Amino acid sequence: MASQTIVEVRINQKPFSANKMHYRDGKIDTKEYKEFRSNIRELLEGDYGIKPTDKLRLTLIVGYSSKLADLDNAFKPLLDSMQPCMGFDDRQVFEIKAMKNHVKKGEEYIMLRLDRMTDNQWGKRQAQMFPKFHIGEKE
């Protein structure tokens, strides 16, 4: 069984940085983060039939206008915004494939795809990533 795409979308919005999610020692969400979460909810809210036992793969390309932006800063705010409106927990994400692109200011975006992986695919992916260590192979 091949992986099943749950959602694939381009969001014409600036990727949000994990560094700007909270203030007051991480206790309060920033206004900008609340707005980002609301936008993601409007775009993605729905019943996707994701089960608690599903293994998920997130694939994304983020278009940043700042050449100083770190790719990994996009993961946490995006996943935390997706999970309540799509019905999954980010602990179900077993693989993230990501790239960044530099774009002009005002042309920022997030392209994302969320796939359901089979156990067999998950084991094969581990072996492909580090063949030297024989990860995911049956003994």
What are these regions (language model features)?
Residues 1-139:
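Acidic, proline/glycine-enriched N-terminal capping motif
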